[in-house]
Curated annotation (Swiss-Prot):
It comes from Rattus norvegicus (Rat). InterPro entries: Leu-rich_rpt, Leu-rich_rpt_typical-subtyp, LRR_dom_sf, LRRNT, SLRP. The gene is Prelp. Gene3D superfamilies: Ribonuclease Inhibitor. LRR repeats lie at residues 90-109, 110-133, 134-157, 158-178, 179-202, 203-228, 229-249, 250-273, 274-298, 299-318, 319-357, 358-377. This is Prolargin. Keywords: Disulfide bond, Extracellular matrix, Glycoprotein, Heparan sulfate, Heparin-binding, Leucine-rich repeat, Proteoglycan, Repeat, Secreted, Signal. Binds the basement membrane heparan sulfate proteoglycan perlecan and triple helical collagens type I and type II. SMART domains: LRR_BAC, LRR_TYP, LRRNT. Residues 1-21 form the signal peptide. May anchor basement membranes to the underlying connective tissue.
Length: 377
């Protein structure tokens, strides 16, 4: 027994020495937990700063006119005109006194400095379309008594400019951000013939009973593509053309058009007009020549006058049409074509497609409107 113990003893010593030579296992490294990523949300797109704009075009060759701004063009054969359009301008140059026609469209102009116009008192025409103008200093317009044409389409105006010159004949302010019309802004514009306010943010509350007061000779009024629900009040009686497309108008007050003896053209496409909102004889106007009522909710063809030549009723809810009922003249016998053309309905073009009608065209319709050249169903 003792002999066997001594035999195992060397073996145990060898195993102990091998175990002592092995490296001890290192303690595990404790890593810090990674922070959870915070959710990211898309940031709103910021408008481009002026530094992002393309650089102005290099100045052209010297002009024959010493006072011609280098960034513009002064045509030798048209000394009263100054062309500064489409040149990536940020500022309006100094306008020479000899200039009557000023072209500044398609630039990046944000304001109209008084200094630029102080000597240009003879201006008659200014085109500022497609710029970035937010407001017009009334001191600029006050010093332009002869200005007749002011074009400021495609800018960032929020209200109609004040202190408009008395001799203004055309004022174009479409495709802006206009939601306000200052009181009395049109009161002295007796010579204004055209007022274009389409594609703005005009609502019913903007138009008061005296908004158009003073526009005694206005011939064309364009209020299309706004947010009107009612017909504008007190439209000047001299009006010839009225544009109200793409609003939300549902009703036309009874007798609304009776005070417009010269009204020849009405556009009211893309509204919410229905039979309920159209009193009888709403459009039976003596001098009306063209009537657009497409894309509404009309179920019956409205009464029209003898003189109407073009009628657009496409894309409505019309299911049937009775030529005898809509005929503006009481013709005793359809087969007897009267030689008095004044009493024959003048309708030449009738559009009815996009309704619930099917060919053929009713015979009584053709018998009434003998001058019809085109009918679209």
């Amino acid at each position: 027994m003792r002999a066997s113990f001594f035999w195992f003893l060397p073996l145990l010593l060898i195993l102990a020495s091998v175990a002592q030579g092995q490296p001890r296992p290192k303690p595990g490294i404790r890593r810090k937990p990674k922070p959870r990523p915070t959710p990211s949300f898309p940031q709103p797109h910021e408008p481009a700063e002026p530094t992002d704009l393309p650089p102005p075009l290099p100045p052209g060759p010297p002009s024959v006119f010493p006072d011609c701004p280098r960034e513009c063009y002064c045509p030798p054969d048209f000394p009263s005109a100054l062309y500064c359009d489409s040149r990536n301008l940020r500022k309006v140059p100094i306008i020479p006194p000899r200039i009557h026609y000023l072209y500044l469209q398609n630039n990046f102009i944000t304001e109209l400095p008084v200094e630029s116009f102080k000597n240009a008192t003879g201006l008659r025409w200014i085109n500022l379309d497609n710029n970035r103008i937010r407001k017009v200093d009334q001191r600029v317009l006050e010093k332009l008594p002869g200005l007749a044409f002011l074009y400021m389409d495609k800018n960032q105006l929020e209200e109609v400019p004040s202190a408009l010159p008395r001799n203004l004949e055309q004022l174009r302010l479409s495709q802006n951000l206009i939601s306000r019309i200052p009181p009395g802004v049109f009161s002295k514009l007796e010579n204004l013939l055209l007022l274009d306010l389409q594609h703005n943010r005009l609502s019913d509350g903007v138009f008061k009973a005296d908004t158009f007061q003073g526009l005694k000779n206005l011939m064309q009024l364009n209020l299309a593509h706004n947010i009107l629900r009612r017909m504008p009040p007190k439209v000047p009686p001299a009006i010839h053309q009225l544009y109200l497309d793409s609003n939300k108008i549902e009703t036309i007050p009874s007798g609304y058009f009776k005070d417009f003896p010269n009204l020849a053209f009405i556009r009211m496409n893309y509204n919410k007009l229905s039979d309920r909102g159209l009193p009888k004889n709403s459009f039976n106007i003596s001098n009306l020549l063209v009537l657009h009522l497409s894309h509404n909710k009309i179920s019956n063809v409205p009464a029209i006058s003898n003189k109407l030549e073009h009628l657009y009723l496409n894309n409505n809810s019309i299911e049937k049409i009775n030529g005898t009922q809509i005929c503006p003249s009481n013709l005793v016998a359809f087969h007897d074509f009267s030689s008095d053309l004044e009493n024959v309905p003048h309708l030449r073009y009738l559009r009815l497609d996009g309704n619930f009608l099917k060919p053929p065209i009713p015979l009584d319709l053709m018998m009434c409107f003998r001058l019809l050249q085109s009918v679209v169903i």
